[in-house]
Amino acid sequence: MSVQENELPQQLWPWIFKSQKDLAKSALSGAPGGPAGYLRRASVAQLTQELGTAFFQQQQLPAAMADTFLEHLCLLDIDSEPVAARSTSIIATIGPASRSVDRLKEMIKAGMNIARLNFSHGSHEYHAESIANIREAAESFATSPLSYRPVAIALDTKGPEIRTGVLQGGPESEVEIVKGSQVLVTVDPKFRTRGDAKTVWVDYHNITQVVAVGGRIYIDDGLISLVVRKIGPEGLVTEVEHGGFLGNRKGVNLPNAEVDLPGLSEQDLLDLRFGVEHYVDIIFASFVRKASDVVAVRDALGPEGRGIKIISKIENHEGVKKFDEILEVSDGIMMARGDLGIEIPAEKVFLAQKMMIGRCNLAGKPVVCATQMLESMITKARPTRAETSDVANAVLDGADCIMLSGETAKGSFPVEAVKMQHAIAREAEAAVYHRQLFEELRRAAPLSRDPTEVTAIGAVEASFKCCAAAIIVLTKTGRSAQLLSRYRPRAAVIAVTRSAQAARQVHLSRGVFPLLYREPPEAVWADDVDRRVQFGIESGKLRGFLRVGDLVIVVTGWRPGSGYTNIMRVLTIS
């Protein structure tokens, strides 16, 4: 039989749920041909022809309805369409290759959700100009309220990091550090802008006290490694273990050394004040080692910056060991795999990644996967196959956001890199085993008397039961949307808000599509709710993931203000 839009008898719903499951299972056991019968599995097209196309997302549907994770893997189909709307947010680092207004417009169109400014490089004047360009590019899409895409701005602090100086050849120069040669690592200020292949200046004055003979110094994410042979009055005499080309202002790592740098430097305090004055949405706090480092950042932001989200970057062994205490006081976590892969063995980075993503998912806090995701696209138009798998597996692990660094800051193909991450994420999201994920998250969730959280759990469960195309939530601060995201619905979460800051910040949460509603409140509360819900529906139609006949879950409050979300309804799109 064929079910037409808006003509579904109520008594057929139990049959639909059973049919979805049975058809998916028959792909494994019911097809002729014995154990290999799954090769002749029911296609998505056959399944949707049986059940009608208006009531659920079609992507990888047989796999989504599998009983076990192994069945789910067997039913994945390379010919299935990707998800219509990407759930994982894309963070792009803004630099010389991407800071023009026209290039930023292209990147927003390609899928950039959060623009990252790296304060390890550039002056305040430089970053102020970048912020102005980002906002101008984002506001160019504001002519249509339905298609307007809020873009968050994130400030990435320098943190207690160590960097090399400037080479005497100038800011764009490079020198080759040859394997087996001798290099002096010094803090003598006369070499700060006069570095060469034999002398490298670093900005950590106590380096001679914390590094022992035989210790290693890694430069530029470990591309260059030096072994300390002698500690002298002028600095550290080292032998090049692995050579390479050294540029300006490259990061330095001292594994196993007890670096005594403060959690926040004087420059960090100035940068955070700059962020508050320029209304940034997110702080990426670098080299967080313990909970007190996060508290120090919060104190530095002051009351004026209390609405800014703090995402702690885990980049060293101590941060991994104290992960739980850091997570408790943070708004989210970033896995900065570059420095982390130097501080701990490279073969253990994937373990740290999976652990951090899992714990963030359980806590319901955003988690960002960063560093070298599409590194080859700095110079090439297409990534390696290993890189595409890395991005996809970060999505499958449960990351809320995936980040581009040098690919967009200095690369030759910044727009193409964003497009590639967008395409990979769409395919990976279709392959997520949502049924198992939701059940595990629900079982692991502690008992709650918070009406908003209880309503969020019920809304996500209802979205699975009725195969809803979307969950529309009206939110003031973004908290309701984040709670819905916590339980990883298969349906898109359309968050309608009047708060521009909330609209930008909810990009940190997976599966949330923010809509900034600019109309003034109606005199009658119920009328205002209906208008905002309709605004969400119209935007969903425009973006292509809502159609006539689809079911949507609507989550609203019972009165104006934040903290009153406890009403859930089911609507049919007409």
From Swiss-Prot:
Positions bound to ATP: 118-121, 163, 250
Annotated residues for binding of substrate: 116, 313, 338-339, 371
Regulation: Allosterically activated by fructose 1,6-bisphosphate.
Keywords from the UniProt entry: Allosteric enzyme, ATP-binding, Glycolysis, Kinase, Magnesium, Manganese, Metal-binding, Nucleotide-binding, Phosphoprotein, Potassium, Pyruvate, Transferase
Annotated positions of the Phosphoserine modification: 2, 19, 26, 43, 292
InterPro entries per UniProt: Pyr_Knase, Pyrv/PenolPyrv_kinase-like_dom, Pyrv_kinase-like_dom_sf, Pyrv_Knase-like_insert_dom_sf, Pyrv_Knase_AS, Pyrv_Knase_brl, Pyrv_Knase_C, Pyrv_Knase_C_sf
Cofactors required: Mg(2+); Mn(2+); K(+)
Positions contributing to K(+) binding: 118, 120, 156-157
PROSITE patterns given in the database record: PYRUVATE_KINASE
Record Pfam families: PK (PF00224), PK_C (PF02887)
SUPFAM superfamilies to which the protein is assigned, alphabetical: Phosphoenolpyruvate/pyruvate domain (SSF51621), PK beta-barrel domain-like (SSF50800), PK C-terminal domain-like (SSF52935)
Residues involved in beta-D-fructose 1,6-bisphosphate binding: 475-480, 525, 532, 559-564
One MF term in the entry's GO annotations: ATP binding
Keyword flag Transmembrane: no
EC number: 2.7.1.40
Phosphoprotein in keyword set: yes
Record field: catalytic activity: pyruvate + ATP = phosphoenolpyruvate + ADP + H(+)
Biological role stated in the UniProt entry: Pyruvate kinase that catalyzes the conversion of phosphoenolpyruvate to pyruvate with the synthesis of ATP, and which plays a key role in glycolysis.
Note: There are 4 isozymes of pyruvate kinase in mammals: L, R, M1 and M2. L type is major isozyme in the liver, R is found in red cells, M1 is the main form in muscle, heart and brain, and M2 is found in early fetal tissues.
Full protein name: Pyruvate kinase PKLR
Gene symbol of the encoding locus: Pklr
